Curated annotation (Swiss-Prot):
Consequence the record notes for mutating residue 550 to M: In breast pleomorphic lobular sample; somatic mutation
Organism of derivation: Homo sapiens
UniProt enzyme class: transferase
Effect of residue 503 to R: Loss of kinase activity
Protein name: Fibroblast growth factor receptor 4
Length: 802
């Protein structure tokens, strides 16, 4: 060590180094890393204040150690030496000095240089050319070189043809001395992405251009122009964006294939599905009922073995473990999307296990065995047939219904098969789809409600006689909700009544409605409890209709809560009773948004996608606690009528993200888009999004990148948050965790003195009026500058991880 320090002292005392005076650029960088040299000449580099520095010596894996003024640099910090690299985040005056790089385990000098302080990058003295003041002898000791491609093999793919919605990345990795710069052109014109929906990402250190969610208007010739003082080079990429053509799923020919297996073996049936829109996939097994595989109408009886929809994992492979003779038969892979259905079938043949003694026996013994086996099998079959007929008659007298797991499908509709699987009950699953005929014609999937014997779940079952039903609160998608008094909901106080809400089916409900209500009940069991969601309190499943008991929100949904508390204004036309509580304060509005974000963050952590987040689906308790409702609904997203209003007059499409609207893709990030619309509802005090905009026109406006304008009196920071939620690229939207953090900062920054909306907002003029408004698309509801908008003050935007 002493020898090393002594050597450093000698090296640092050598006078008269040649000078390297570099212009202020994005980064001081020597690329590629230099190989070890025994005679590395000392040099000087002039670095502008605030300029990042990255120097390297040796190969990346075995680079040398960096020293400054005899002290070895640590691998972390603002100035660090790491894997042969010297990195300075932002050059400061104290960073000037002598730097050495020595090879690992030897005294070989890889780099010997002095960094001196130059002018600041922010200097505005542009009257003189700094090159004119440099002495020619102070040039870089390395020869100048025109730009050249460092990885031409990565640029061989000249034509990029991709479907709309994909991400495209063009790379032009280059080097030269001095370090070249890169510019991008589209069809011969400078390209900065300012007019492109979603913008672009320029990664200069990677020499790349990235465009997410490409559309047909992105077609063209993209040119990377790399240049320095010595020369320039360019390369052209051709981009063709293929429009999405509506088509039903395409199944690969020959799959699934006919398969033969031996009893006890494992079988895999493969079904390769190609679909632009998100497909539903089902595996079906054809079965026999009463000796027939088909019903009177000619459609087959099938059993649903495996199903996947938008939120399920891939099911293109059907696994059959330890097959038996009963597994033999016909299997069908059924795939469907919003356009139509496709299916292909295959046969599975199951052979008995081979007996090794069978092949070694003499021919005479074989014939004897055949006769014995045949006689015994025939006798056994007769006995089983008689026993089956007797048992069938006995069961027919008690339960005149076909087996519960059997369906007879008409034209293979995409019917769901629900199971009672609760993490809390621990009971085995039982099918909820009885043996009835399903028809794909008409909105009512099944006519006539049947009763199902649901298993008792002791953790959730509530005595029916301790529930007193009250007046109706409203109607949902498939049932009604009534207010009720539950006695003994708290076991410690058996005689105390608690106000609850009870979900039940309407009189004209169908089998599908019952399955949906049971599905919602099971989802709520699995989701668990949180302060900002409607929690399940109990269920009544025995000896009567199904009741799902949930928390009651006394102040109704958030939209009506906001509208009832609007300050008076000449243009206000209230559609409900005015609240006596008076106008809401600004911190209360932010708190509403914060609570909803917390509830959605919890649902996201439980892998639950809401798909219909809006102010109408957020309920408000007596203590002004926001609770997200209807997160457990089983929505048929592939059969949404985009031009049909809901029962309360709202158009669901106005809350839907573009990828959900156009491609039926629902994710947590599409819920984030809906949260941005909900924010707009909050700060317009219950306004209707896109007032007066026809649905057909809304589609084209969203495609062009138009977004709603900032509501009156909404702070720019919160409007910036809305615009972040409405980013065209789902991956660039914030997560709910980030939204919670951002809104929490807003709450902390708000003064303790509440701001009266009478003073802050002034007389209310509902720019977000009712859907009956007659304003045109040219009104101020839209901001006509495409995304991305001006910067938001929140710490996310580009590069958000989902």
């Amino acid at each position: 060590m002493r020898l090393l320090l002594a050597l450093l002292g000698v090296l640092l005392s050598v006078p008269g180094p040649p000078v390297l005076s570099l212009e202020a650029s994005e980064e001081v960088e020597l690329e590629p890393c230099l190989a070890p040299s025994l005679e590395q000449q000392e040099q000087e580099l002039t670095v502008a204040l605030g300029q990042p520095v990255r120097l390297c010596c040796g190969r990346a894996e075995r680079g040398g150690h960096w020293y400054k003024e005899g002290s070895r640099l640590a691998p972390a910090g603002r100035v660090r030496g790491w894997r042969g690299r010297l990195e300075i985040a932002s050059f400061l005056p104290e960073d000037a000095g002598r730097y050495l790089c020595l090879a690992r385990g030897s005294m070989i000098v890889l780099q010997n240089l002095t960094l001196i302080t130059g002018d600041s990058l922010t200097s505005s003295n542009d009257d003189e050319d700094p090159k004119s003041h440099r002495d020619p002898s102070n040039r870089h000791s390395y020869p100048q070189q025109a730009p050249y491609w460092t990885h031409p093999q990565r640029m061989e793919k000249k034509l990029h043809a991709v479907p709309a919605g994909n991400t495209v990345k063009f790379r032009c990795p280059a080097a030269g001395n001095p370090t070249p710069t890169i510019r991008w052109l589209k069809d011969g014109q400078a390209f900065h992405g300012e007019n492109r929906i979603g913008g672009i990402r320029l990664r200069h250190q990677h020499w790349s251009l990235v465009m997410e969610s490409v559309v047909p208007s992105d077609r063209g010739t993209y040119t990377c122009l790399v240049e320095n003082a010595v020369g320039s080079i360019r390369y052209n990429y051709l981009l063709d964006v293929l429009e999405r053509s509506p088509h039903r799923p395409i199944l690969q020919a020959g799959l699934p294939a006919n398969t033969t297996a031996v009893v006890g073996s494992d079988v895999e049936l493969l079904c390769k599905v190609y679909s632009d829109a998100q497909p539903h996939i089902q595996w079906l097994k054809h079965i026999v009922i009463n000796g027939s595989s088909f019903g009177a109408d000619g459609f087959p009886y099938v059993q649903v073995l495996k199903t996947a929809d938008i939120n399920s994992s891939e099911v293109e492979v059907l696994y059959l473990r330890n097959v038996s003779a009963e597994d033999a038969g016909e299997y069908t892979c059924l795939a469907g999307n919003s356009i139509g259905l496709s299916y292909q079938s295959a046969w599975l043949t199951v052979l008995p296990e081979e007996d090794p003694t069978w092949t070694a026996a003499a021919p005479e013994a074989r014939y004897t065995d055949i006769i014995l086996y045949a006689s015994g099998s025939l006798a056994l079959a007769v006995l089983l047939l008689l026993a089956g007929l007797y048992r069938g008659q006995a069961l027919h007298g008690r339960h005149p219904r076909p087996p519960a797991t059997v369906q007879k499908l008409s034209r293979f509709p995409l019917a769901r098969q629900f199971s009672l699987e609760s993490g809390s009950s621990g009971k085995s699953s039982s099918s909820l789809v009885r043996g009835v005929r399903l028809s794909s014609s008409g909105p009512a999937l099944l006519a006539g409600l049947v009763s199902l014997d649901l298993p008792l779940d002791p953790l959730w079952e509530f005595p029916r006689d301790r529930l007193v039903l009250g007046k109706p609160l409203g109607e949902g998608c498939f049932g009604q909700v009534v207010r009720a008094e539950a006695f003994g909901m708290d076991p410690a106080r058996p005689d105390q009544a608690s106000t609850v809400a009870v979900k039940m089916l309407k009189d004209n409900a169908s089998d599908k409605d019952l399955a949906d209500l049971v599905s919602e009940m099971e989802v709520m069991k699995l989701i668990g409890r949180h302060k900002n969601i409607i929690n399940l309190l109990g269920v009544c499943t025995q000896e009567g209709p199904l009741y799902v008991i949930v928390e009651c929100a006394a102040k109704g949904n958030l939209r009506e809560f906001l509208r009832a508390r609007r300050p008076p204004g000449p243009d206000l036309s209230p559609d409900g009773p005015r609240s006596s509580e008076g106008p809401l304060s600004f911190p209360v509005l932010v708190s509403c948004a914060y609570q909803v974000a917390r509830g959605m963050q919890y649902l996201e952590s439980r892998k639950c996608i809401h798909r219909d987040l809006a102010a109408r689906n957020v309920l408000v308790t007596e203590d002004n606690v926001m609770k997200i409702a209807d997160f457990g609904l089983a929505r048929g997203v592939h059969h949404i009528d985009y031009y049909k209003k809901t029962s309360n007059g709202r158009l669901p499409v106005k809350w839907m993200a573009p990828e959900a609207l156009f491609d039926r893709v629902y994710t947590h990030q599409s819920d984030v888009w809906s949260f941005g619309i909900l924010l707009w509802e909050i700060f317009t005090l219950g306004g209707s999004p896109y007032p007066g905009i026809p649905v057909e026109e809304l589609f084209s406006l969203l495609r062009e990148g138009h977004r709603m304008d900032r509501p009156p009196h909404c702070p720019p920071e919160l409007y910036g948050l809305m615009r972040e939620c409405w980013h065209a690229a789902p991956s660039q939207r914030p997560t709910f965790k980030q939204l919670v953090e951002a809104l929490d900062k807003v709450l902390l920054a708000v003064s303790e003195e509440y701001l009266d909306l009478r003073l802050t907002f002034g007389p209310y003029s509902p720019s977000g009026g009712d859907a009956s408004s007659t304003c045109s698309s040219s009104d101020s509801v839209f901001s006509h500058d495409p995304l991305p908008l001006g910067s938001s003050s929140f710490p996310f935007g580009s590069g958000v991880q989902t």
